[in-house]
Structures are given as C-alpha cells and as structure tokens.
Amino acid sequence: MSRRSQRLTRYSQGDDDGSSSSGGSSVAGSQSTLFKDSPLRTLKRKSSNMKRLSPAPQLGPSSDAHTSYYSESLVHESWFPPRSSLEELHGDANWGEDLRVRRRRGTGGSESSRASGLVGRKATEDFLGSSSGYSSEDDYVGYSDVDQQSSSSRLRSAVSRAGSLLWMVATSPGRLFRLLYWWAGTTWYRLTTAASLLDVFVLTRRFSSLKTFLWFLLPLLLLTCLTYGAWYFYPYGLQTFHPALVSWWAAKDSRRPDEGWEARDSSPHFQAEQRVMSRVHSLERRLEALAAEFSSNWQKEAMRLERLELRQGAPGQGGGGGLSHEDTLALLEGLVSRREAALKEDFRRETAARIQEELSALRAEHQQDSEDLFKKIVRASQESEARIQQLKSEWQSMTQESFQESSVKELRRLEDQLAGLQQELAALALKQSSVAEEVGLLPQQIQAVRDDVESQFPAWISQFLARGGGGRVGLLQREEMQAQLRELESKILTHVAEMQGKSAREAAASLSLTLQKEGVIGVTEEQVHHIVKQALQRYSEDRIGLADYALESGGASVISTRCSETYETKTALLSLFGIPLWYHSQSPRVILQPDVHPGNCWAFQGPQGFAVVRLSARIRPTAVTLEHVPKALSPNSTISSAPKDFAIFGFDEDLQQEGTLLGKFTYDQDGEPIQTFHFQAPTMATYQVVELRILTNWGHPEYTCIYRFRVHGEPAH
C-alpha cells in the first residue's frame, strides 16, 4: 500500500472516531472533513468546526499561532478546486518540494518544529481523550479562554492579510500600478472607441433624448467598472499579484515559539497541514509564473501602445508611469479630430464625385442637344437645297420672254423706289444743312446779344442812378450779372440742343415711315450694332446708368447700431457632437454690395425694419433704387419676402433721432427686379445719412429680405 493510500485510510479512520466522540479528537475530525467534503460544504461547516474548539485544553502561548494558521488554512481551502483537482495537484512532481526550499520561503522552520513535537502531541491527545469518547470537565480546568483566543486569532489573521497587502504596495508598487494602468487603459480605449462610434452614428443626428441618455450612461458604466474592480481585488483577489509575500507573512507569523502547542498537535493534523502547505507553495509557484507571463504581456502591450502613440504623433511618455488625465484627453481629442477630418475628407470626395457625375450628365445632355440641333440644321439645309434645286428647275422651265418681262417690271419698280429715296435723302440733307447753318449762327447771335447788352449797360446804369436820387440799394454787382448771363447762355444752348435732337428724331421718324410705306422693312447692320452697343453700355453702367452713392466699395457704410436685428436661421452651419456652434446669417452690409444672387440678402424679423446708411459723399438725393431677385430664380417661384411699402428719410448728422421724410414708394413684385423711384420734391437739401424704413412686405410672416439698396443724386459741391 502506498503512502498516499495509508494517509487516506488514516483520515477515514480519524473521521469515524471523531463522529463518535465529542471530546479531544474533534479537532482532527473537523480537519479531516475539510478535505473529504466539497468546498461548498466546507464553507457551510466552517463556523461549527470553529465552535468545537471550545472544550480544548489550554495549550500554552503557542496556541494562538496554531489557531491563526488553522483559520488561514480554512480561508485558503475555500478557494481550492474540488477533490479531483486537488488529487491532480497532489500527484504533480512540484508537490514534493524539498524542505530546504520551503525554509528559504520561511515555512520550513514551522514544519520541522511540528515534526519534532509529533510524539508529544499524540501522547497528550491520548491522555485527554477517553476510551468511551466522553470527557470530564475536570480534565479541562484552566482552558475556558479558548474562544477568546480563537476570536483574537481571527482578528490577527485579518491584520496579517492587511499587512501583507500594505507590504506588497510598499515593496513592489510598480507591478500593482502597471496592472491597474493596463486595466484602466484597456477600459479607456474601449470607451474612446465607443465614443467615436457614437460621434459618427448617433451624436451627429438630432436625437436629444438619446444623446442625454448616453451621456448619463457613460459615467454610470465607468462607475460600475470601478466598483466591480474594487470588489474583485478586495480582499483576497489582491493576493494573486504577489502570493510569495502573503506566504512569507503567514510563515513569519507561524515561526513564533509554539512549544506547548506542538506538544498537543496530533499526527494526522500535522500531515494535513503539511499537505496543505505543499499545495499552497505549488499554487504560489504557478501564480508567480502567471504573474511573470502577465508582466511580459503587459510590457509588450505597453511597447505597442507607445509605438501607436509615436505613429499617431502623440508625445511619448517616459518610463512605465502611464498616461495622465490630460494626455488621455489629448489622445481622445486627437482621435476625434482625425475622425472628423476623415469624415470631412470623405464628404468632400463624395461631393466632388457627385458634382463630377452631374457635370458629366450635363455634358452628355448638352452634347446630345448639340447633336440634335446639328441634325436639324443638316435636315433644314438639305430641305433648302432641295427647294433651291426645285426653284432652279422651275426657273429653267419658264420661258425666256416671261422672265424678261417680269425682270423689266421689277427693275422699273426698284428704280422708282430708288429715285424716291434719293429725293427724300436730298430733302433731309437740305434740312440738315439748314439746321447746321442755324446752329452755326447761334454763337454769332449770342455774341451780338452780349455786345448789345454791354453797349446798353452804361446808359441803363445812368438812367437808374438818375432815377430817385439815392437808389444805390438796388444796384446789381458784376458777379451777379455774369451769373445771370451764364444762366441765360446755358438755357439757350439747352434749347438749341433740344431743338436739334427733336429735328433729328423727326427726320429719323419720317425716314422710317417713308421706308415702311415704300415696302422696305427691317433694320440695317449699323442700327443693330448701335442697339447692341447701347444695351451693353447700359449693362456696364450697373444696368441703370446712375451713380450709386450707397456702394460699400465707393466709401459708403452701414451704421449697424441703428439697424434692425438680423434674422437667424434655425439650421446650424457648424456643429460638434450635435451641439450647434455657428448659424449662417448675413449682416446689413450685404445691401450695399453689388453681388446679387438668391439667398445673399439681409433678412430681419417680421415685415417691418429699418437700416441707416452713411453715403460716400454729401449729395442732393434725386432717386433711390431697390433690387430683388426675380421670380424665375426663386425656388418656389414667389418672392413673398420682398419689401412692399417703404419710406426714405434724410439725416443731417449721425446722432439725429428723427430724419426728414423724402418720399414713400411701393416695390412691385410683378415688375422688373431693379426698380428706381424718383423724388417729387422740386428742391432737395443735401444729406449724407439716409434711412431705409420698410413698412410692409409681400406676405412672408417670418422675415423680410433686402438684396440691394442704391441712392442717386447730385454732389453738394
């Protein structure tokens, strides 16, 4: 029979003896049940086994160490696997560790001391236990304080475990912090990855309630992870970091002088302790191997993380201290910014691809239209050639006589028309020469009138002085007379120019009427060029041909403190994590800029608003122009946001509260996009500050848009 079979037989016999007695063999019996029962039954029977120590005799000062070690063995036993696993561990070669190795660990001394006191303990137990299994109270006189010592031993065991934890933190904090940093880094990396996914797929959408729930759930999950980690590592899980320190602390506690207790220890109990200690040492070796492997894996992960940080451009962290909170936030911001840049780049590529596809479609459509038009032109040219060939054949089929007669008649008619035109041109030339002679005589007539006035002026002065005696008050100065003469001269020249233009227009009208009567319909090439030139000139003159003194590039500006509040749109142009950062809106400056296209306008709340403009120069206002986009360019073919009734006020200075009303006008939404309104006042003062006050619009309930506002007039100097 092997030694292992003998030990199992001895434990079975000890268990049977312990079940029939209630005295001194209770300790051995309870200890044997720890290895016969399952771990679950061991935990349930732990309290009862400890209570059975109460009738034990006084074992001397070393009993505390034994009780503490026994309690610690019970605690370690609760973490052991079932009996099959223990037998496998027992059969391993590592369980047969030499006593010298255990002495190096700090446990060999206690084992040898227990081995030396084996005979004494057996004899003492035989003395205390009776053959019938019962014992007398007289045998246990002086042993009433065992319960107090067992409670103190449990407290001492808890203190020893706490001391081992503190000793591990004090001696090797690097490993503890590396493990904690690895666990926190992995958790944080997963959280940042989840946050990036939330930013892309959830937070960019406008789910306010879901976003609030996720922001609440994120710290809750973090708190749950921290709580689980604290529960997992306290109090026994922390022993897995450095089991050698825990065993050293327990061995140090067990090396106290225990001569009296060793005399009472039984042989089966000692062998059970030896077996448990050997298994504990084997587990310690395996845990140390696992810790070494875990440390190497952690170092590999740390090196990989550092390479990743260097690759991503993040500043490297020296040593093994880990990343701080600010560095982690910086890494998170870097990841988010890179993700955002990648999304923007993808959006730009998709937009460019879509625009390219639309351009390709437009090119294809344009090419198709061009091909269709070319086919139509070719078809029309072929039809024309066929018609010409038909006319040629018809003309060749006509007789020569009929052709000559018709040709002679047509030539006569054309000669008559040409003669009439020559006569009309001669009459027109005569009229033009007469008008030119009259225009040429005008300076002579003006000079004659001037000479006559100058010749008669002294006589008039003498007559005026001779009349009434002291009438010097009514004298005219020379400057006033010259001003009146210049005014008379300008009036005469203006009248002559009007007469000349009127005569030219009458001649052109009569000529066109004559040509229409004679059957000549159409315009000449010179007239077409003249019309096109006039149209291009009018377009180059800002489409109205009037100087704009409210142009921002010319020096005008908007007094923003005296304008209505700008209407803000509800759609954010830029947002971060679903939070709007910037809304798109135009300032009142846009009404002074010539860039007019749909949407580029200044909008204010409601149908009523105002804007005050400082002109580029002090002028005498003559007209204002209001411009809006046409209905054809509007997406819904309506311009209900256009102003309808408005008024113009003039201010002498910027700080003036109420201005002078210059006029009230109405913008027609069915008219031209650019509408000019002239002031009706015969005399107008000079102003440099003008207010545009919108009274109503064309029906939009939320806002009113102004695209461009112009002011025309004459300079004050």
From Swiss-Prot:
Q: Which residues form a coiled coil?
A: 273-296, 348-440, 475-506
Region: Disordered; residue ranges are 1-66
Which residues are listed as membrane-spanning? 213-233
Report membrane topology: Single-pass type II membrane protein
Domain called SUN: residue spans: 555-716
- What keywords is this UniProt entry annotated with? Coiled coil, Disulfide bond, Endosome, Glycoprotein, Meiosis, Membrane, Nucleus, Phosphoprotein, Signal-anchor, Transmembrane, Transmembrane helix
User: Where do the segments described as Sufficient for interaction with SYNE1 and SYNE2 lie?
Assistant: 507-717
Perinuclear space-facing ranges: 234-717
The residues that the database entry marks as glycosylated are N636
Q: Which GO terms describe its biological process?
A: centrosome localization; meiotic cell cycle; mitotic spindle organization; nuclear matrix anchoring at nuclear membrane; nuclear migration; nuclear migration along microfilament; nucleokinesis involved in cell motility in cerebral cortex radial glia guided migration; positive regulation of cell migration
Pfam families, alphabetically? HTH_SUN2, Sad1_UNC
Annotated GO CC locations: chromosome, telomeric region; condensed nuclear chromosome; endosome membrane; meiotic nuclear membrane microtubule tethering complex; nuclear envelope; nuclear inner membrane; nuclear membrane
Which residues are modified to Phosphoserine?
Answer: S12, S38, S54, S110, S113, S116, S136
Record region (LMNA-binding): 1-139
* Disulfide cysteine pairs (residue numbers): C601-C705
Impact upon substituting H628A: Disrupts interaction with SYNE2
Q: How is it modified after translation?
A: The disulfide bond with SYNE2 is required for stability of the SUN2:SYNE2/KASH2 LINC complex under tensile forces though not required for the interaction. The disulfide bond is proposed to be conserved in LINC complexes involved in force transmission.
Give the Phosphothreonine positions (modified residues).
Answer: T107
Q: What is the effect of changing Y707F?
A: Disrupts interaction with SYNE2, impairs localization to the nuclear envelope
Subcellular locations according to the entry: Nucleus inner membrane; Nucleus envelope; Endosome membrane
InterPro entries listed in its UniProt record:
SUN1-5, Sun_CC2, SUN_dom
Composition bias of kind Low complexity appears in: 19-32
Q: What does this protein do?
A: As a component of the LINC (LInker of Nucleoskeleton and Cytoskeleton) complex, involved in the connection between the nuclear lamina and the cytoskeleton. The nucleocytoplasmic interactions established by the LINC complex play an important role in the transmission of mechanical forces across the nuclear envelope and in nuclear movement and positioning. Specifically, SYNE2 and SUN2 assemble in arrays of transmembrane actin-associated nuclear (TAN) lines which are bound to F-actin cables and couple the nucleus to retrograde actin flow during actin-dependent nuclear movement.
Q: What is known of its domains?
A: The coiled coil domains differentially mediate trimerization required for binding to nesprins and are proposed to dynamically regulate the oligomeric state by locking the SUN domain in an inactive confirmation. The coiled coil domains are proposed to be involved in load-bearing and force transmission from the cytoskeleton. The SUN domain may play a role in nuclear anchoring and/or migration.
Q: How does it assemble?
A: Core component of the LINC complex which is composed of inner nuclear membrane SUN domain-containing proteins coupled to outer nuclear membrane KASH domain-containing nesprins. SUN and KASH domain-containing proteins seem to bind each other promiscuously; however, differentially expression of LINC complex constituents is giving rise to specific assemblies. At least SUN1/2-containing core LINC complexes are proposed to be hexameric composed of three protomers of each KASH and SUN domain-containing protein.
What name does the UniProt record give this protein?
SUN domain-containing protein 2
